[in-house]
């Protein structure tokens, strides 16, 4: 339970820059990583896969929206981790750890019975914010989500852009549907949280401690840390990938790095960027 100051500082230095990266940058970077001609495919080709040309695979965007889910996790996990670390530092973990050990609780059972309720209560608003954004996201869905059919938020955007008046009515009603879906998701999340909280309170009153061996506890903790580090690493490499592609002149498959670097794409399209940049500022 104890948190080392230097470890927290290191993780914070990694997480904060990931939070500041725009969502669309992460989405484009993930697309450049996992698509058939992406960086991951180039790393294992041709020495492992035997591919000398990009394979004909439908990886991203995929039919089930897995790449969109991955992109949302990559972008929102740093925010939730930062909020969680800030909450953990406010809790006297050393004192609670001593009390948990004296009551006979193990690492995992003590976390779920004592620490998790306090952390979950403080993080409820942050989780609901992330949930509302994930349901209504448009920019990442335009890049990573399937288009046949597209998510409701993307369909609303397309209807709003349509010149036909009937599409405007569809966009308005779709926005109401999206609001209702968002409210339902938030209510369902709160309901599940209350149900699990009630179950753990009953188990606590019954004296269930779920004693688990130290090896299993550390293995479970290691799996959770590995999953978090995987998505944090994916976020870092997706940002690097988007930056690399911005300076590419010639990059043939399966070369790991571009053959030529330059600013030709910036120079040729600079006039196209001027007005959007002004509007953004």
Where are these regions (language model features)?
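Short hydrophobic faces within alpha-helices
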Residues: 17, 95-103, 171, 277
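Amphipathic alpha-helical segments in well-structured domains
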Residues: 11-14, 96, 149, 153, ...
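Juxtamembrane helix-boundary/capping and inter-helix hinge elements in multi-pass membrane proteins
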Residues: 3-7, 89-94, 105-108, 147-149, ...
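Juxtamembrane inter-helical linkers in multi-pass membrane proteins
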Residues: 51, 98-110, 199-214, 254-264
């Amino acid at each position: 339970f104890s948190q080392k100051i230097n470890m927290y500082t290191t993780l914070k230095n990694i997480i904060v820059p990931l939070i500041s990266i725009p969502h669309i940058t992460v989405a484009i970077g993930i697309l450049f990583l996992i698509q058939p001609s992406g960086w991951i495919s180039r790393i294992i080709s041709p020495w492992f896969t035997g591919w000398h040309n990009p394979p004909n695979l439908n990886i991203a965007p995929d039919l089930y929206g897995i790449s969109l889910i991955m992109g949302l996790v990559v972008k929102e996990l740093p925010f939730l981790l930062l909020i969680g670390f800030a909450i953990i530092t406010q809790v006297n973990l050393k004192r609670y750890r001593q009390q948990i050990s004296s009551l006979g609780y193990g690492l995992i059972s003590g976390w779920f019975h004592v620490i998790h309720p306090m952390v979950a209560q403080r993080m409820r608003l942050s989780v609901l914010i992330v949930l509302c954004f994930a349901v209504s996201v448009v920019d990442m869905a335009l890049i990573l989500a399937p288009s046949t059919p597209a998510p409701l938020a993307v369909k609303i955007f397309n209807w709003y852009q349509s010149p036909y008046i009937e599409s405007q009515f569809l966009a308005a009603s779709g926005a109401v549907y999206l609001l209702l879906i968002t409210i339902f998701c938030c209510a369902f999340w709160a309901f599940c949280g209350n149900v699990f909280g009630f179950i753990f309170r009953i188990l606590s009153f019954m004296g269930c401690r779920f004693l688990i061996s130290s090896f299993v506890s550390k293995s479970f903790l290691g799996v959770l840390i590995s999953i978090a580090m995987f998505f944090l690493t994916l976020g870092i490499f997706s940002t690097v990938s988007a930056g690399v592609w911005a300076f590419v002149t010639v990059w043939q498959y399966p070369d790991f790095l571009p053959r030529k670097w330059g600013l030709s794409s910036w120079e040729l399209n600079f006039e196209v960027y001027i007005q959007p940049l002004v509007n953004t500022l």
